[in-house]
């Protein structure tokens, strides 16, 4: 898919930030396709998934109107986006804009006797210079034995975190990042 191509390019090298510090103001770094363009645009893909289409496009319109015929920094975008959505994206920007690399997920799941479904989410980082932990909403899709589906969102705030959620059918499979909503490489999901 189109997004998978971006993921493959971005994760082809473990490190690198979207943010370009003043000490790195060289044209090859400012216009780096993997970091400035591909990883930078993937931050927008993730933000769109996190806030939903309507909120995302309204926030983009507000930002565009606010900075029309002017210049803006990444922090100007963050402030405008937060004002439009009413959400705090400090941790997101610390991890994804200023931080290097990306998380690699290992997710274990099991269905309980009451049909609820439990998950254990662990993550490692692509490089030791990456943030110690990427706080992130995680997209999960559960498919049932009769074809039912449930799209779940796990708010992953710590490593080795456990979740138990209600489910009204018998699960046959679980998919993670099923529409490439977030940036990760080779996640594993096991029962």
Segments predicted by a language model, with ranges:
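Beta-strand-rich binding/interaction modules
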Residues: 103-105, 109-176
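Short acidic/polar inter-strand loop motif in beta-rich domains
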Residues: 178-190
């Amino acid at each position: 898919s189109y997004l998978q191509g971006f993921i493959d390019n971005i994760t082809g090298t473990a490190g690198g930030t979207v943010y370009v510090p003043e000490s790195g103001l060289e044209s090859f770094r400012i216009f780096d396709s993997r970091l400035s363009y591909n990883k930078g645009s993937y931050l927008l893909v993730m933000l769109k998934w996190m806030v939903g289409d309507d909120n995302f496009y309204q926030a983009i319109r507000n930002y565009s109107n606010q900075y029309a015929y002017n210049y803006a920094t990444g922090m100007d975008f963050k402030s405008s986006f937060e004002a439009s959505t009413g959400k705090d994206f400090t941790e997101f920007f610390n991890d994804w804009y200023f931080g290097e690399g990306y998380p690699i997920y290992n997710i274990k799941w099991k269905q309980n006797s009451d049909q609820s479904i439990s998950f254990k989410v662990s993550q490692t980082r692509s490089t030791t210079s990456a943030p110690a932990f990427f706080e992130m909403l995680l997209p999960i899709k559960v498919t049932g034995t009769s074809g039912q589906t449930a799209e779940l969102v796990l708010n992953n705030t710590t490593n080795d975190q456990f979740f138990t959620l209600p489910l009204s059918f018998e699960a046959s499979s679980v998919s993670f990042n099923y529409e490439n909503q977030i940036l990760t490489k080779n996640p594993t999901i096991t029962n």
